[in-house]
């Protein structure tokens, strides 16, 4: 399809959907949307090749919503996503687009949620279900997810599901769906396994291929920072270390604009929030203050910042990483205006590394990592700024009266002038001390790990890993009842554990494959609920029945000895690159809060 419709209204979508799109600021469909929406409205199967950030979520959700039977309280649309983050994102998009379609219910299903909450939500009859393959397959086997009324199936980021080892689960799910349904498959690349699925399960699909033309200007210096510790503290440190005329900080939610603005105000920064709740008069007043220099920092959402064009902005901070590449490019494009150089910084959480890779892949360039500014730099910056203020006072002409006061202080207290000046300097520093204590937070050694992880992304099969004999003190050894005889590979185990347990793959330790079982190192402190979740988890359609090995050191020595005796080179298939080194490991409580947090539906 070559013709690109000028607006969404011309595509023939439900007026209530158009109302939501207008409110969200959608005007002109992207190429993938203009190509896919008419085909899906007609009931055709679609095979779409497009990068993340091309607008593919709207490309499949809008036409499927249009064809939905609101009165039927049963799953009619099923979306498979590789990660819980993407599942939540897609579910939120469906909810936003159907805001004015009264009676539409959307349910995300993924590992880590309590089953009773999911079962209760399923009994309410959601028309749209978005989930990860493992959890969806589990519900199908339990008989708690009824797909007899399904007419629309979407595979989002199919190549990512293949990479994470979920493709067998995907095929199992697709084999249980009624034959009379419509399928949309989206993938950034088209490996043979994805082609095989399209040939087996799709009916004469129309192939849509969209070439990414997202580019950034070379005069914008980009970098990212891997988040550790408190983001607000890091934000303040970056602002203090950076020379900027004005900066805009992008966040995802309206509440975040207020929270970040309040945090900056408490630390002496002249900032303001910009969100959709502001009336037009206040919005214009805020932007005018930014333009004329009475305001230096603006915290905004993507929607609120639409159309914002201020030449003073020299620094853009992505406090919350955008979910698509196009939004990232639009954000950072607001700096470096009027022939000036710009600077863009991206905060990346551990669980958001996939989004960073998507941005880099789409832009066809690598974004360098930066470190948190050191205390020495902050001390130097504060001293320089303080010296400027002192110099300004020295150049003023009204110091005579203060000189007289100084004489009184000096003669009364019998102090030498240097000690008195030091005392006054300490008093004058205010809330920003000129002498800063060394960093309390010790950064984990992420640099090589993260860079190596990205380099290994495309050549997993050729990687070799060093053997580690001992179990780290911050890890526990578990046994799972799947092994080489089941066709299991390390990538299958990593994908299942990371997705179902919401554990970053870097915190999965040594994995050893044996004939009928495998062993895996996981962080200490796993809750009973999470262990039960893993017990129900399936890999290649087989329950793993995870069990803690009490005498882990003895067991590890035993299996290592047996591996050497049998000369089984494949028994040591995966050893994490220092994930649990004592010097790099977070505290046990940090493991619990970061990796084992339970989420409700």
Curated annotation (Swiss-Prot):
Cellular component GO terms held in the UniProt record: cytosol; ribosome
Annotated catalysed reactions: ATP + H2O = ADP + phosphate + H(+)
EC number(s) on file: 3.6.4.13
Motif residue range(s): DEAD box: 156-159
SMART domains, alphabetized: DEXDc, HELICc
Keyword field: ATP-binding, Cytoplasm, Helicase, Hydrolase, Nucleotide-binding, RNA-binding, Stress response
Role played: DEAD-box RNA helicase involved in various cellular processes at low temperature, including ribosome biogenesis, mRNA degradation and translation initiation.
Family to which the UniProt record says this protein belongs: Belongs to the DEAD box helicase family. DeaD/CsdA subfamily.
Binding site for ATP: 50-57
Domain Helicase ATP-binding: 37-208
CDD domains assigned to the protein according to its UniProt record, in alphabetical order: DEADc, RRM_EcCsdA_like, SF2_C_DEAD
Gene: deaD
Motif Q motif, residue range(s) on this chain: 6-34
The protein's name in its UniProt record: ATP-dependent RNA helicase DeaD
Top-tier EC class: hydrolase
Region (Disordered): 552-601
Gene Ontology MF: a single term: ATP binding
Primary location recorded for the protein, binned into one broad class: cytoplasm
Origin: domain of life: Bacteria
């Amino acid at each position: 399809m070559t013709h690109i419709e000028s607006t969404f209204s011309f595509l023939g979508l439900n007026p209530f959907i158009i109302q939501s799109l207008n409110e969200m600021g959608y005007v002109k469909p992207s190429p993938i949307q203009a190509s896919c929406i008419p085909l899906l409205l007609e009931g055709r199967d679609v095979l779409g090749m497009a990068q993340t950030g091309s607008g593919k979520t709207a490309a499949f959700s809008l036409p499927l919503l249009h064809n939905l039977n609101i009165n039927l309280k049963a799953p009619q649309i099923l979306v498979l996503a590789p990660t819980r983050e993407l599942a939540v994102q897609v579910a939120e998009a469906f909810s936003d687009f159907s805001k004015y379609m009264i009676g539409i219910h959307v349910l995300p299903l993924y590992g880590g949620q309590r089953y009773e909450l999911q079962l209760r939500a399923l009994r309410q009859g959601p028309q749209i279900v978005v989930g990860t393959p493992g959890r969806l397959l589990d519900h199908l086997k339990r008989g708690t997810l009824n797909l007899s009324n399904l007419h629309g199936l979407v595979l989002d980021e199919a190549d990512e599901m293949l990479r994470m080892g979920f493709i067998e689960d995907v095929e199992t799910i697709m084999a249980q769906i009624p034959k009379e349904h419509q399928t949309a498959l989206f993938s950034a690349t088209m490996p043979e396994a994805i082609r095989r699925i399209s040939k087996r399960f799709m009916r004469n699909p129309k192939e849509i291929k969209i070439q990414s033309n997202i580019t950034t200007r070379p005069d914008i210096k980009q970098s990212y920072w891997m988040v550790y510790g408190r983001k607000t503290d890091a934000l303040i440190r970056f602002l203090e270390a950076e020379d900027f005329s004005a900066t805009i900080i992008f966040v995802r939610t309206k509440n975040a604009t207020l929270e970040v603005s309040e945090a900056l105000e408490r630390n002496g920064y002249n900032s303001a929030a910009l969100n959709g709740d502001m009336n037009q008069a206040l919005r214009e007043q805020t932007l005018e203050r930014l333009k004329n220099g009475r305001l230096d920092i603006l915290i905004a959402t993507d929607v609120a910042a639409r159309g914002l064009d201020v030449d003073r902005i020299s620094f853009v901070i992505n406090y919350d990483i955008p979910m698509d590449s196009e939004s990232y490019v639009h954000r950072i494009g607001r700096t470096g205006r009027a022939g000036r150089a710009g600077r863009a910084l991206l905060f990346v959480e551990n669980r958001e590394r996939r989004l960073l890779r998507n941005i880099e892949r789409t832009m066809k360039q690598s974004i360098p990592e930066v470190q948190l500014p050191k205390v020495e730099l902050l001390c130097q910056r504060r001293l320089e700024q303080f010296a400027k203020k002192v110099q300004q006072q020295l150049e003023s002409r009204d110091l005579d009266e203060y000189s007289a006061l100084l004489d009184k202080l000096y003669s009364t207290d019998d102090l030498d002038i240097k000690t008195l000046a030091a005392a006054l300097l300490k008093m004058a520093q205010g809330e920003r001390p000129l002498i800063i204590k060394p960093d309390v937070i010790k950064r984990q050694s992420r640099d090589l790990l993260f860079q190596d992880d990205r380099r290994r992304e495309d050549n997993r099969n050729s990687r070799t890993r060093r053997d580690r004999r001992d179990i780290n003190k911050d890890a526990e050894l578990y046994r799972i009842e799947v092994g080489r005889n089941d066709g299991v590979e390390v990538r299958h185990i990593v994908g299942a554990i990371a997705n179902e347990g919401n554990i970053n793959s870097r915190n999965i330790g040594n994995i050893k494959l044996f004939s009928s079982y495998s062993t895996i190192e996981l962080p200490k402190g796993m809750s009973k609920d999470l262990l039960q979740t893993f017990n129900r988890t399936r890999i290649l359609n087989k329950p793993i029945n995870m069990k803690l090995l009490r005498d882990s050191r003895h067991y590890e020595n035993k299996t290592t000895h047996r591996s050497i005796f049998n000369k089984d080179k494949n028994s040591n298939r995966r050893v994490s690159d220092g994930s649990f080194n004592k010097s790099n490991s977070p505290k046990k409580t940090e493991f619990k809060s970061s990796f084992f947090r339970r989420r409700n539906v």
